[in-house]
Amino acid sequence: MDKLPPSMRKRLYSLPQQVGAKAWIMDEEEDAEEEGAGGRQDPSRRSIRLRPLPSPSPSAAAGGTESRSSALGAADSEGPARGAGKSSTNGDCRRFRGSLASLGSRGGGSGGTGSGSSHGHLHDSAEERRLIAEGDASPGEDRTPPGLAAEPERPGASAQPAASPPPPQQPPQPASASCEQPSVDTAIKVEGGAAAGDQILPEAEVRLGQAGFMQRQFGAMLQPGVNKFSLRMFGSQKAVEREQERVKSAGFWIIHPYSDFRFYWDLTMLLLMVGNLIIIPVGITFFKDENTTPWIVFNVVSDTFFLIDLVLNFRTGIVVEDNTEIILDPQRIKMKYLKSWFMVDFISSIPVDYIFLIVETRIDSEVYKTARALRIVRFTKILSLLRLLRLSRLIRYIHQWEEIFHMTYDLASAVVRIVNLIGMMLLLCHWDGCLQFLVPMLQDFPDDCWVSINNMVNNSWGKQYSYALFKAMSHMLCIGYGRQAPVGMSDVWLTMLSMIVGATCYAMFIGHATALIQSLDSSRRQYQEKYKQVEQYMSFHKLPPDTRQRIHDYYEHRYQGKMFDEESILGELSEPLREEIINFNCRKLVASMPLFANADPNFVTSMLTKLRFEVFQPGDYIIREGTIGKKMYFIQHGVVSVLTKGNKETKLADGSYFGEICLLTRGRRTASVRADTYCRLYSLSVDNFNEVLEEYPMMRRAFETVALDRLDRIGKKNSILLHKVQHDLNSGVFNYQENEIIQQIVQHDREMAHCAHRVQAAASATPTPTPVIWTPLIQAPLQAAAATTSVAIALTHHPRLPAAIFRPPPGSGLGNLGAGQTPRHLKRLQSLIPSALGSASPASSPSQVDTPSSSSFHIQQLAGFSAPAGLSPLLPSSSSSPPPGACGSPSAPTPSAGVAATTIAGFGHFHKALGGSLSSSDSPLLTPLQPGARSPQAAQPSPAPPGARGGLGLPEHFLPPPPSSRSPSSSPGQLGQPPGELSLGLATGPLSTPETPPRQPEPPSLVAGASGGASPVGFTPRGGLSPPGHSPGPPRTFPSAPPRASGSHGSLLLPPASSPPPPQVPQRRGTPPLTPGRLTQDLKLISASQPALPQDGAQTLRRASPHSSGESMAAFPLFPRAGGGSGGSGSSGGLGPPGRPYGAIPGQHVTLPRKTSSGSLPPPLSLFGARATSSGGPPLTAGPQREPGARPEPVRSKLPSNL
């Protein structure tokens, strides 16, 4: 109903009441509490309560109809009075309540009995105690006329009011304590009252409505509004509403100092005071005629406003600085104002000069007037100067406005003070300039005054004011005396006064300006002061220059030129605000850390609130191995190295963390951590670490799993962590989703470690000086052409070349074994290198080295074998786990298989024996060269060639048993081979180009013969060195080591005995297959530099040995065979002479077109047993087999003279 317009509410209130019930507008709270507190009624909290009326007495039922009609008339007369004050836009819902005395007894007329009268009297007394008159009017409003609000008589009431004496009147209820005089409205109904009420209804409604609206609007201007300034001063909207109630209850015309009316009035007085303080000195000093109309009007208007302000100050509340409560009591306001600034304001507001002139003009004596005329004028000017005392009022108002601007617009208080000080200095300079001219004028311009000396007596007032102002500012700024030094005594004293005032103002200005400048960048000033103390400390202790420089760099990186007391600042904030700030400051850390990305947000917040920021310089040891750990660290920015004894260092970069292992195990540090760059870290103490993990057990399990994985990567174990993790796994504490999250965190940690290794290898690897022939193929076609000639292969085995050429690069070979290698295996594998290099026999002459086919080199390159450092980007990555079929499970060969290879039964045992899983090292340059599919024959077991065991010097339990041979063409020497050597075969996918016709399925003999391969380069054979004229024996394959996680690759110039490889080429998901265009392009690049093979080599290719029909045509033994066995017996188990391409199918000859003339050959690789088609030309075919024991013809290569 409160949302209805006032006219409709008045109509609803004037409706006739029901007989059995009556509607009452009441507050939900108790009326007595509301009135006692003087509180404001909230219209939205009102509700309608229906109170049942007592049934009329039987004796009073006779006159029910008449009383009902009179009640309706009284209700009509009551409506306007009640509705006049219901619509209050200002919330002014004040009430004055009272009680009505009944005008007649409840008994019936002449027929009423005494008992009936007594019964009616009781009900009438209960009715009288009800609240009837609820007028909503302010204390200043007129009371409701009695004739307008008459209580409707109850049904059955008697028409003769004088039949019985009226009952005693209800005593008036006390109104609010803040009201001056409580009142009681008593409405008396007389005969004809309803008619009188009907006659005055329209006029009273209009008059009361207009008066109430104006009073409410004006009253709202005297109360504090709900704005930004009031909310900051009082704290909340409820407090502002309570202050509004205090203003209404304080009395009539009490003005709140924060009200809108006082705000605009102060603004008007401020402008008027500034005008007076500027215009009045100029008018008094430079204008002699002060009786002009504009001057009089200006003074009268100004004085009138100041007198009104003087009166309003007695009704305006006073703000006490030491107390939050504002004084609103009129008596206290009056006493406090009289004791403070009343006298000064009164004197500055009274027109004393005009009063003096009026008094003086009443004297009729002409002589007196003539004698006193000049003195009267002078005295009047002096009295006019009393208006300048309004400066005190200006200062008070400016001070209030400083608070308003500071609270409302957040302006710096120092800036406001500077502006006020500048304005005050300019005003004092203005007054001083007027004073410099006023004093000589009051003395009638003596000859020694500066005005007479400069002949400025009769000049215009503008020129006089300009020179006077110049003279005054020269004195106040202490820069001179103006045009000339003072001569007369009055000028001397005025000059001294100006100097004193000016020096004081100048000192105040310098002080405020200095404070303002310092407050603009206090954090930088604090940093500079702190660093000055540090410099004095370093000088006092005579620290060396390098230490001083490190301290200087630390301060620059740690504080970056600004210093804050961050702990104190965050400690003063609330908990939600502090968490929000910390989350914002650590947003980069959270974004770069997978641990936080997969964790609960509450865990992240709890962890971040306990972090402490630290900075470390390059070379600082953050933690040391063997010490007791008290902190763990999170890397926000920087690179650190994890150093362990006997293992290669590990790099950690942005988003990683370390130092958690000893916090979990409560032990000592398992590794040292050194900062490589400037590192910005966040540390977490052990107490806070355990406190957070107690609330989040899943994150404790994640920390333990990652710590166990990290220990495994550096070759260490911790039984406590292992027991905890296994216990959690067995107990099933965590569900599947939580386990998946933990596994994701562990996987992210591994990937970040691998990324750090790749970054380290790319940033810190320095290439060793090697011949141009070892330069990678991708750098220059000419270098690639030189690297693929037969000279490159011959240089590999030349005995007179320096050993530095064949030394493995820093990032490859045995020097960079992965974390999985233990020191025991490392020493054992390193012991094989000197003997292998020392016993290797070179080729008889470079001319005896044949040029192998391009297919063999591509196969070996794509198979994932080790390569020199220059070829490391081109090598495929190996999987972190052994691929399917690594354990030697046989599978049926398919006709479409391109190459048949051998695998090792029981390779998984050999893999585990070497310790640790193989980590992958990806290279972006490698993905186009990886084969698109694995050959199904890769997992097919095949017999080991003769002499395939015993050459590596490995323990017998590491080597698998030789599988049974399925090749019908295997020689008897192959069956009787001595055990002890290892044969490994790798398979690649078919490498064919669009020019290559489809191949037919291979016979079983070819599958069995594919087990042959090249022996490890540099390994010592069992027998002696055989001359190169012996027929080649069954070659041995080359066990290649996969790339490590650190990015290192094995060298082809040293035997890579670091670890066994998986027996087939692993393929990563999403890797595109090798495109034939890449091979064709390589062929076209080299074809110009090497146009054709030597003719002798072409002739030799047409010859084939019967015993070599089962061998792969891509197998090239590079060393002379040991022993003097001939033919294909292979009983000696040694290495054969420099090999030639042999046909894979008997009865066919091998042809090499010109396009395949070693053009696309990579740098020399160790040769393996494999077979592939020729890229860029027709398939290679085998020539007729040569007789057993026939000596192969030596092939002399035609090399350019520059090589």
UniProtKB/Swiss-Prot annotation:
Basic and acidic residues composition-biased segments: 121-133
Q: Could you tell me the membrane topology recorded for this protein?
A: Multi-pass membrane protein
Phosphoserine PTM positions read 138, 1105, 1108
What is this protein's name? Potassium/sodium hyperpolarization-activated cyclic nucleotide-gated channel 4
Write out the tissue specificity statement of the associated record: Highly expressed in thalamus, testis and in heart, both in ventricle and atrium. Detected at much lower levels in amygdala, substantia nigra, cerebellum and hippocampus.
Top-rank taxon of the source lineage equals Eukaryota
Q: Which gene encodes it?
A: HCN4
Q: Which residues span the membrane?
A: 264-286, 294-314, 337-359, 379-399, 414-436, 492-517
Q: Consequence of mutating residue 680 to E?
A: Abolishes cyclic-dinucleotide modulation of HCN4 channels
What organism is the protein native to?
A: Homo sapiens
